Amino acid sequence: MDKKTIYFICTGNSCRSQMAEGWGKKILGDEWQVYSGGIEAHGVNPKAIEAMKEVGIDISNHTSNLIDQNILHQSDLVVTLCSDADKNCPILPPSVKKEHWGFDDPAGKPWSEFQRVRDEIKTAIESFKTR
């Protein structure tokens, strides 16, 4: 069976989409190819790397990437993680399903916000898996 493709998108591909890619690979990796991208590329936030390391997921080798049109158009599901990405998501072909899962941006906030958003993303992906 071929794996489906899920593409997580946020503004800068720095925090939320990076954590979603890490969780997605861990939770959905048997059934889904998991990618992330951004409307812009801001670099992976070191606190996002640390937050995921705290739960045993290494995203230190991730890179911050602009949305890849090839991945976007070949995805089965595109998930926007912030309102900016939701509003500015490129037009998708009819074959690509899009969902919006909004999460607060932890960038520039206290450590506890990174942990909270990380855990909320995990819960959303676990919930998605059981649909």
From Swiss-Prot:
Q: What is any one GO biological process for this UniProt entry?
A: response to arsenic-containing substance
Annotated GO molecular function terms are: arsenate reductase (thioredoxin) activity; protein tyrosine phosphatase activity
Domain of life of the organism in this record? Bacteria
Keywords assigned: Arsenical resistance, Cytoplasm, Disulfide bond, Oxidoreductase, Redox-active center
Chief location: cytoplasm
Cited function: Catalyzes the reduction of arsenate [As(V)] to arsenite [As(III)].
Instruction: Give the family this protein belongs to, as stated in its UniProt record.
Output: Belongs to the low molecular weight phosphotyrosine protein phosphatase family. Thioredoxin-coupled ArsC subfamily.
Q: What is this protein called?
A: Arsenate reductase 2
| UniProt source species | Staphylococcus epidermidis (strain ATCC 35984 / DSM 28319 / BCRC 17069 / CCUG 31568 / BM 3577 / RP62A)
Gene for this chain: arsC2
